């Protein structure tokens, strides 16, 4: 019985030692991963901030924003741009004139509206042709034309044309896509942060398990040592019992038998 108990204690001790060793390897691996957490989080944020800085530069150059967007307000800022406010229309005016009349001087809004109206009429004139046409007219003819085209109906038509061109421009499509890109980069940063937090949590759990397994291994070793001591004591007890039995037999043979002879 004692030998069976000793064998079981030995098996338990070996298993506890193997568990402790395995958890030691796991904690070492997780510690290596967690040592890179700060670098990963920082790198992800740097990538995101670089994208945001590029977006700010592009929108500023387009005249769509004056102040830099932040991660907390970029969505509302871009939504505001896409609602066709005065800043968007002003940027649209500059964009249209810049692309079709690169060398033109700075125009007032009323002149731009007039040029846009001329380009929007069904006369097969683009903006450049309309401006050249204005320059070639006799001053008195230009005065009459301006009076005609700056009527309320003409202004409304020019404004509607400008709204249509800005709203349907590639620039506005790019602005809408920019919002999606910034949202995706935020998801990327959040995912990296969640990963590193998960690694840290796993490492903390592994360390707790490792501490427990070390205590278990120490306990099973103590148990094994105790059973082994018991086994050795049982052997000594057996030897002592034999010796006692031999002594009693000898005492009986040499003492008691002679007395009762």
Where do the PLM segments sit?
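Long, amphipathic alpha-helical coiled-coil
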Residues: 1-261
């Amino acid at each position: 019985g004692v030998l069976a108990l000793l064998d079981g204690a030995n098996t338990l001790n070996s298993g506890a030692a193997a568990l402790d060793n395995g958890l030691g390897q796991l904690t070492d691996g997780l510690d290596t991963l967690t040592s890179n957490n700060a670098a990963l989080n920082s790198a992800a944020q740097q990538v995101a901030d670089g994208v945001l800085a590029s977006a700010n530069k592009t929108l500023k150059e387009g005249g769509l924003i004056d102040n830099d967007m932040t991660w907390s307000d970029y969505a509302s800022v871009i939504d505001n741009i896409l609602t066709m406010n005065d800043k968007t229309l002003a940027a649209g005016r500059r964009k249209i004139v810049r692309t079709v009349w690169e060398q033109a001087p700075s125009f007032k809004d009323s002149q731009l509206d007039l040029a846009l109206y001329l380009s929007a009429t069904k006369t097969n004139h683009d903006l450049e042709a309309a401006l050249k046409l204005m320059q070639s007219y006799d001053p008195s003819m230009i005065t009459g034309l301006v009076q005609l085209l700056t009527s309320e109906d003409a202004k409304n038509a020019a404004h509607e044309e400008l709204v249509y061109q800005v709203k349907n421009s590639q620039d506005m499509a790019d602005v809408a896509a920019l919002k999606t890109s910034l949202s995706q980069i935020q998801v990327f940063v959040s995912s990296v942060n969640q990963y590193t937090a998960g690694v840290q949590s796993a490492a903390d759990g592994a360390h707790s398990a490792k501490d427990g397994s070390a205590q278990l291994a120490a306990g099973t070793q103590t148990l094994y040592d105790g059973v082994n001591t018991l086994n050795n004591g049982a052997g000594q007890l057996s030897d002592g019992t034999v010796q006692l039995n031999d002594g009693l037999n000898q005492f009986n043979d040499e003492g008691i038998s002679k007395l009762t002879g």
